[in-house]
Amino acid sequence: MEQSLMDKLTILADSAKYDVACTSSGASHPAKRGTIGSCYAPGCCHAFTADGRCVSLLKVLMSNCCAFDCSYCVNRKSNDVPRATFSPRELAELTIEFYRRNYIEGLFLSSAVLGTPDYTTERMLTVLRLLRNEYHFGGYIHAKTIPGTSPELIQQMGYLADRLSVNVELPSEQSLHLLAPDKGRHSIFRPMKQISVAGEESRQELTLYRHAPKFAPAGQSTQMIVGASPETDYHILQLSEGMYQKYGLKRVFYSAYIPVSDDTRLPALDTKPPLLREHRLYQADWLLRFYQFKADEILDKDNQSFNPYLDPKCNWAVQHYGLFPVDVNRAPFEMLLRVPGIGPNSARRIRDARRLSALGLDELKRMGVVLKRAQYFIICRGFSGAHPGRGSAGRERITRALIDPNVFSAGAEQLSMFAPPAVDRLVEQGVPPRAAQRMVREEAVQCLARAL
């Protein structure tokens, strides 16, 4: 039976929902005369899916008919799911019609491996050429590079798309070999290096000739699945830092593994996605990108997992409490970034404003400093610090101020997303959810207070 365009869209949009490497553009180029669409740095429109994930653009697969059999993937060839494939013309027309109706502002295009990586990429390139050359589409395009694609095709794709991405998927070669035997380390990192080198060459050409063609002007990103394999948070964070430094990635996305396969090599189907762990990885990733932290400072070989109760920055501050309090009127910019409650924008405002006069609490509050957390780590004009002292009451006070409220948020939805295992166990034993949260919170407060 021949599938309608709407049937294909329903199947292939649903098949793409597990790919989270999709965000606002990061590239800026205004509309040109005679073209349709524009791409601005603030990014394309965003939408929230039913499961709470933020997605943007028309996110769809070219095909979900896959020649690979990655055990963690819903589109693997051995899985019995509805299959569909767009023709290049169908997908190009669908994108441009959605754009004209103001449904979307760009396209996120990926695909299962239809036959071979090169054949799949050639079909994706046909879509991009139709959009750019025939329909004169000037909007944002994020294209997924298929591992194993030839360098020539990747080069062509880079001049048609605003951003490219190659998904690492699993954090180690051993896990790739076990769960995705059709993929290998070389097939992933070779195109990643090629995109990095080509992007740098393109930027250098633009300094000499402003009309030189741009290669993936919004850079590249990748995605890792968290919880499908046994790698620790420390291992994942080390890998992310290495990719940022070696390949100049714009983003590393983390996706909590959602069980889709009854496979003994994977977590059981009733396993809850590790959403709190995913959340902590994003927080730590932010510290790497914007707060001048190193991966070894956030986690180390002796502590390879994130603290479930404190965010990574607060956890670092508690572990290094001897470095505090810092005088915000004298502390180096790098140290200001490490104070809980002070972000990059607030740190820059403090650095600029203190040249004119000494700052007090009122000024810090106006600059966006979160004093509820920062007060335990700073001194300033007219304020000598709200330090916990040596008593247990003081230690509990700072712990209660720093503990992550998301872990103990009330309500079934938040409980299912962020509750630590201890809360789940108490609820299963018949303890009301709110009471279970209070009990675990008090135990966590006591443990963290003793660590100060």
Describe each model-derived feature in a short phrase.
Residues 1, 214, 234-245, 275-277, ...:
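Long C-terminal interaction/binding lobes of large macromolecular proteins
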Residues 353-354:
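Residue-level signature of tetratricopeptide-repeat
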Residues 265-337, 373-422, 426, 451:
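Long, highly charged, low-complexity intrinsically disordered interaction regions
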Residues 204-212, 254, 294-300:
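Flexible, glycine/charged-enriched surface loops at secondary-structure junctions
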Residues 233-257, 262:
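Long, internal scaffold/assembly segments composed of regular secondary structure
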Residues 1-65, 370, 378, 386-452:
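Flexible, acidic/Gly-rich N-terminal and inter-domain linker regions that tether
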Residues 1-68, 72-222, 226-230, 243, ...:
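Conserved Radical SAM active-site core
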